[in-house]
Amino acid sequence: MSEVLITGLRTRAVNVPLAYPVHTAVGTVGTAPLVLIDLATSAGVVGHSYLFAYTPVALKSLKQLLDDMAAMIVNEPLAPVSLEAMLAKRFCLAGYTGLIRMAAAGIDMAAWDALGKVHETPLVKLLGANARPVQAYDSHSLDGVKLATERAVTAAELGFRAVKTKIGYPALDQDLAVVRSIRQAVGDDFGIMVDYNQSLDVPAAIKRSQALQQEGVTWIEEPTLQHDYEGHQRIQSKLNVPVQMGENWLGPEEMFKALSIGACRLAMPDAMKIGGVTGWIRASALAQQFGIPMSSHLFQEISAHLLAATPTAHWLERLDLAGSVIEPTLTFEGGNAVIPDLPGVGIIWREKEIGKYLV
């Protein structure tokens, strides 16, 4: 096979609706501002990926970064690891972090998708693993007692064996009321994860988490500011229940710092922020060496492939950011994600829908 080159990069900014707004203790995400990426190759295949900007304020900047990076990658070989190394070097003075790192991850994910298509194999098999069901939890919001309970019951009826609910209400009693109501509705053999979204200081996090661990929660996620690894370590040291973090690690190097000081007993990198497929591979090796169970954050389509190839795979987060513009090739059965038997990641754009949400 002759060398496959990158021949073009197209980006489209969209702002798509969510089935439920994502309410958190620190704010609400009402829509999903996404950058859709198409990476064309000399083999005739096109790799697809998308990025989540979190806020519409950052959407155009993220798209522009990708557009400006196009000239750096066109006519380069379709070799994701080498592309990542080149971009890391090009941006070392500006700082290979933040939106720059996120944009580079979008290129990486699209390149791996294209590589799978070139070899006519799903990404999971390209990574050397077999496709298998990946256990998933249904990810919810700061919904209040009634809606949180209703959504948990619905998830259980759909076959899920765990849910995550966001907490961080004004009073601890409110956090406990939500967890207790869910527990009463779904029973003891059902996982309940809780997420504070960085909303507490360390003393408050210790106090609330010590109360919550008596309720049998599976983990307590980001109880304090995500960059405060020492604070997380102090919280974890006072608890039996695992602290979960990682969605804001910008690259495996941040994961290494957190794990090295015992900031958490569970890890959940975000496929975008950790550095795409290339960053995830490195992160999964760290998790294996530290003996840390590793879950995913958002990006459920590609994360299913990645977790199936992760030695310490734990849970996939089911939260459908892009369902308005992506065909539902990733399915869920009996609480598990079922990887599609399609080349690459399996992302297929719903082109007729994309036009409705272009920014």
UniProtKB/Swiss-Prot annotation:
BP terms from Gene Ontology: amino acid catabolic process; carbohydrate catabolic process; mandelate catabolic process
Record pathway: Aromatic compound metabolism; (R)-mandelate degradation; benzoate from (R)-mandelate: step 1/4
Chain residues that bind Mg(2+): D195, E221, E247
Cofactor(s) listed in the protein's UniProt record: Mg(2+)
CDD domains, per the entry: mandelate_racemase
Organism domain of life: Bacteria
UniProt remark on cofactor binding: Divalent metal ions. Magnesium seems to be the preferred ion.
Annotated binding of substrate, by residue: E317
UniProt-annotated catalytic positions: K166 (proton acceptor), H297 (proton acceptor)
InterPro entries referenced in this protein's UniProt entry, alphabetically: Enolase-like_C_sf, Enolase-like_N, Enolase_C-like, Mandel_Rmase/mucon_lact_enz_CS, Mandelate_racemase, Mandelate_racemase_C, Mandelate_racemase_N_dom, RHMD-like
Molecular function GO labels: hydro-lyase activity; magnesium ion binding; mandelate racemase activity
Tagged with keyword Isomerase: yes
Keywords from the UniProt entry: Isomerase, Magnesium, Mandelate pathway, Metal-binding
Listed EC numbers: 5.1.2.2
Catalytic activity: (S)-mandelate = (R)-mandelate
Signal peptide, first to last residue: none
Family, as annotated: Belongs to the mandelate racemase/muconate lactonizing enzyme family.
PANTHER family: ENOLASE SUPERFAMILY, MANDELATE RACEMASE, MITOCHONDRIAL ENOLASE SUPERFAMILY MEMBER 1
Record note on quaternary structure: Homooctamer.
Protein name per Swiss-Prot or TrEMBL: Mandelate racemase
